[in-house]
From Swiss-Prot:
<dbReference type="GO" id="GO:0005200">
    <property type="term" value="F:structural constituent of cytoskeleton"/>
</dbReference>
<dbReference type="GO" id="GO:0005882">
    <property type="term" value="C:intermediate filament"/>
</dbReference>
<keyword id="KW-0403">Intermediate filament</keyword>
<comment type="similarity">
    <text>Belongs to the intermediate filament family.</text>
</comment>
<keyword id="KW-0175">Coiled coil</keyword>
<feature type="region of interest" description="Coil 1B">
    <location>
        <begin position="148"/>
        <end position="239"/>
    </location>
</feature>
<dbReference type="Pfam" id="PF00038">
    <property type="entry name" value="Filament"/>
</dbReference>
<dbReference type="GO" id="GO:0045109">
    <property type="term" value="P:intermediate filament organization"/>
</dbReference>
<feature type="region of interest" description="Tail">
    <location>
        <begin position="402"/>
        <end position="463"/>
    </location>
</feature>
<feature type="region of interest" description="Disordered">
    <location>
        <begin position="1"/>
        <end position="47"/>
    </location>
</feature>
<protein>
    <recommendedName>
        <fullName>Vimentin-4</fullName>
    </recommendedName>
</protein>
<feature type="compositionally biased region" description="Low complexity">
    <location>
        <begin position="17"/>
        <end position="37"/>
    </location>
</feature>
<feature type="region of interest" description="Coil 2">
    <location>
        <begin position="263"/>
        <end position="401"/>
    </location>
</feature>
<dbReference type="GO" id="GO:0005886">
    <property type="term" value="C:plasma membrane"/>
</dbReference>
<comment type="function">
    <text>Vimentins are class-III intermediate filaments found in various non-epithelial cells, especially mesenchymal cells. Vimentin is attached to the nucleus, endoplasmic reticulum, and mitochondria, either laterally or terminally.</text>
</comment>
<feature type="region of interest" description="Coil 1A">
    <location>
        <begin position="90"/>
        <end position="125"/>
    </location>
</feature>
<feature type="domain" description="IF rod">
    <location>
        <begin position="97"/>
        <end position="405"/>
    </location>
</feature>
Length: 463
């Protein structure tokens, strides 16, 4: 705020003039000095009033002449030369006063225009301040509250969605755990089935070895039977040869007993023994073969059942493996979705936090702007108050000057009469002019400092 200074100085009166009779007189002179300086928050005014004391002094706003001498006697004649000189001086002073009044009026009009302009600016600032207080803050507050509610709603939805996903994840984890336990049981059963199958295979191998051994024994028995048959046939041939030789010998020598029946009996006995041995061997072979076949059938049935169980277990394992893979894929998908949702929620929360920070910064900026407008408004109020004080001071000075200017015509005749009285009654008077300086400092419309100083400016000797 620029500092405005104004000063107003008025000087009235002139040097005392000697009349033709050689008497001396002192006219009263007055001097007013007003200065003001305005600063934001502090205003000071200084008013200097000095007057030269004489036998006739001014008192109060209406200027009246009062004499300290005894009442003057009316002279027989009036000195019109002195009155003419005083009238000329008064006219010159009136001309100067008129020019100064015109200048003062122009400055006063400029001050009034400036005050009006400042009042308009003040009204504009007050309107802007009211608008910012009424609409701007509430609108921003409503937007802020609405966005906060939306953020809270989305955050609640995200929390609920996260809880639901966690419940699904826990359920899937439980299902996966159950499937893993079931898979473990199936693997244990599979290992047991493989162990049983291995034992069955060992039994089958043993049965196969026993069957091969029995087959080898049957072959050896068959070979032995063939050998016995050959041996029996050979013995029969030998016996027949012996019998033929014995028949010949009997025929040649003597008649011997009949051996055909004996040979027949022996042959019959050997054939019976061979048939019995062959039947026993065949029965033993058949019984062993039947036992081995039954054992092989039993082992084959167990093997077939084991293979079927193994195939079933393999299919179940494949099914469970597929389900586990699907569960793993679903779990990974859910975990990926959950991570994406957490990242999205974190990003949205960061964006909302940035929005909240930006709104808070805007609110803080608007508060600072409101504070700045309030300070400017206070400064304008201080300037307006200082201008009002200065205008009031000018008004008082103008009223005082107008009331003082209305009396010079009447005072001239009085002064002329007093001069003639002084000629007839010389007086020795000592006059002293006193200078009063009063300084007042104000801030925010309150007086903070006030001081007064008295100075002896001039001493006058009146005879």
């Amino acid at each position: 705020m620029a500092t405005t200074k104004s000063s107003y100085r008025r000087i009235f009166g002139g040097n005392p003039r000697s009349s033709s009779s050689g008497s001396r007189y002192v006219t009263s002179s007055s001097r007013y000095s007003l200065g003001s300086s305005m600063r934001p928050g502090t205003s000071s005014s200084r008013m200097v009033y000095s007057t030269s004391a004489s036998p006739a002094v001014f008192k109060s706003s209406s200027v009246r002449l009062r004499s300290s001498l005894p009442p003057a006697r009316m002279a027989d004649s009036v000195d019109f030369t002195l009155a003419d000189a005083v009238n000329l001086e008064f006219k010159a002073n009136r001309t100067n006063e008129k020019a100064e009044m015109i200048e003062l009026n122009d400055r006063f009009a400029n001050f009034i225009d400036k005050v009006r302009f400042l009042e308009q600016q003040n009204k504009i600032l007050v309107a802007e301040l009211e608008q910012l207080k009424g609409k701007g803050t509430s609108r921003i507050g409503d937007l802020y509250e609405e966005e906060m509610r939306e953020i809270r709603r989305q955050l609640d939805q995200a929390i609920n969605e996260k809880a639901r996903v966690e419940v699904d994840r826990d359920n899937l984890g439980d299902d996966l755990q159950r499937l893993r336990e079931k898979l473990q049981d199936e693997m244990i059963q599979r290992e047991e089935a493989e162990g049983n199958l291995q034992s069955f295979r060992q039994d089958v191998d043993n049965a196969s070895l026993a069957r091969i051994d029995l087959e080898r024994k049957v072959e050896s028995l068959q070979e032995e039977i063939v050998f016995l048959k050959k041996l029996h046939d050979e013995e029969i041939r030998e016996l027949q040869l012996q019998i033929q030789e014995s028949h010949i010998q009997v025929d040649m020598d003597v008649s011997k007993p009949d051996l055909t029946a004996a040979l027949r009996d022996v042959r019959q006995q050997y054939e019976n023994v061979a048939s019995k041995n062959l039947a026993d061997a065949e029965d033993w072979y058949k019984s062993k073969f039947a036992d081995l076949s039954e054992a092989a059938n039993r082992n084959n049935e167990a093997l077939r059942q084991a293979k079927q169980d193994t195939n079933d277990y393999r299919r179940q394992i494949q099914t469970l493996t597929c389900e586990i893979d699907a569960m793993k894929g679903s779990n990974e998908s859910y975990e990926r979705q959950m991570r994406e949702m957490e990242e999205n929620f974190a990003l949205e929360a960061a964006n909302y936090q940035d929005t909240i920070q930006r709104l808070q910064e805007e609110i803080q900026n608007m508060k600072e702007e409101m504070s700045r407008h309030l300070r400017e408004y206070q400064d304008l109020l201080n300037v307006k108050m200082a201008l009002d004080i200065e205008i009031a001071t000018y008004r008082k000075l103008l009223e005082g000057e107008e009331s003082r200017i209305t009396i010079p015509v009447h005072s001239f005749s009085t002064m002329s009469l007093r001069e003639t009285n002084l000629d007839s009654h010389p007086v020795d008077t000592h006059s002293k002019r006193t200078l009063l300086i009063k300084t007042v400092e104000t801030r925010d419309g309150q007086v903070i400092n006030e001081s007064s100083q008295h100075h002896d400016d001039l001493d006058l000797d009146l005879e």
